[in-house]
Amino acid sequence: MNKVITTAAVILCLAGAANAGDARTSHNRSTAMASSAHQILVGVDADFALPLSTYGDINGPGAGALLTIEYPVIEQVSLTARAGFQYHLDKSPVAGVDTHVHSIPVLLGAKYYVMQSDRQGLFAAAELGMFDLMTSATIGGASGSSNNVKFGVGAGVGYQWNQWNARVNIHSHDMGSFGDALMVTGGIGYQFAGF
């Protein structure tokens, strides 16, 4: 009877060790990218944008893409940089008038991984930076446009899984008119390289 119990215990230990080895190899790439200290992670985010408040009166829904860079500084905190372009559909606040505000965000920030130590799971993010706001209006046959560079801030939450992430953000594209330039974005991202 002792031989059976001993054999069963050895088999269970070996099976557990083999299973742990399989779990490590199945996430080999994500662990290598996520746990490397001071490694720059490069990716791309695609998002859908919905303007709020009075910003929604002159700007339609939009979509965009951003190049992302993440630099881990300590176990749960990374510095981030994101830059890209956001295209918005026309909005007609008055009959015969079409307006939109495209933007080029250049943002610096930080990302805090809440529950995990290997840069996986729930995270919170905060960003600040410049928004190049390209406003265009068409009235009848006449059109006009202007560019304004504004300072803005944002915050968001998301979830990181291997190289993929999903996040929801709220940004103010203009700190001078904080409540009048709010934008909610949601999207997915993929980290494709690490240096």
What residue spans do the PLM features occupy?
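Gram-negative bacterial Sec-dependent N-terminal signal peptides
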Residues: 1-19
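Short glycine/proline- and aromatic-enriched beta-strand/turn motifs that initiate or cap beta-hairpins
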Residues: 19-71, 110, 128, 132, ...
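Flexible, solvent-exposed loop segments that connect beta-strands
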Residues: 27, 48-58, 84-103, 132-149, ...
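Outer-membrane beta-barrel channels and translocator barrels
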Residues: 37, 72-76, 115-119, 161-164, ...
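Residues that define the transmembrane beta-barrel architecture of outer-membrane proteins
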Residues: 38-40, 59-63, 100-106, 120, ...
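Residue-level detector of the transmembrane beta-barrel scaffold of outer-membrane proteins
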Residues: 41-45, 78-82, 121-125, 165-167, ...
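Predominantly the C-terminal beta-signal and adjacent terminal strand-loop region
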Residues: 82-94, 153-195
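Surface-exposed, polar helix/loop patches in the mature regions of secreted/periplasmic/lumenal proteins
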Residues: 111-145
